[in-house]
């Protein structure tokens, strides 16, 4: 009678010891697909809107027009980032060692980028509107500073790959076409 119970306890202990530590519930391939599709959509959307902004400003000769177009750009970029954060949250955490930590750190990095974008949006709204040339120069400077915010997302992804060294997760990211498009491979 005690042998089946003892064998059951040993099996539970062994299974627990072999289970990934701090793992999530999402298969690595599903996680990579969701995250990279979200990141690709975000990156492409921001790039398209930035190019459209540049084209739309050609010939703009009043502060109201310039302000409106930049306002649309910043609002769209913050909204896209909110959508990306939601996508990553919805993806859950990968079922790998420290998958919850990976997901948590990725979400924190995206929230930091969102904060930087929202800060740029506030700086933009505070620009003086009395001089078109000065206003446009200030707006361009703020927009150009966004490059650092956006680049930080890519840097964070690289750092996460080095910090969380799950072979299964790295393989899933490497095999996922959306991730390959992000990395240019």
Please tell me what each predicted stretch does.
Residues 21-76, 178-184:
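Immediate post-signal-peptide N-terminus of mature secreted/exported proteins
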Residues 33-47, 68-82, 104-118, 137-151:
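Generic structural signal for well-ordered, non-transmembrane alpha-helical segments
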Residues 46, 50-53, 81-92, 117, ...:
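Extended amphipathic alpha-helical scaffold segments
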Residues 1-8:
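Bacterial N-terminal signal peptides that target proteins for export
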Residues 116-182:
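A charged, solvent-exposed segment within the mature domains of Sec-exported extracytoplasmic proteins
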Residues 82-107, 119-132, 160:
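Short, solvent-exposed, charged loop/turn and helix-capping segments
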Residues 12, 30, 172-173:
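Processing junctions and N-termini across compartments
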Residues 14-17:
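C-terminal motif of bacterial Sec signal peptides marking the signal peptidase cleavage site
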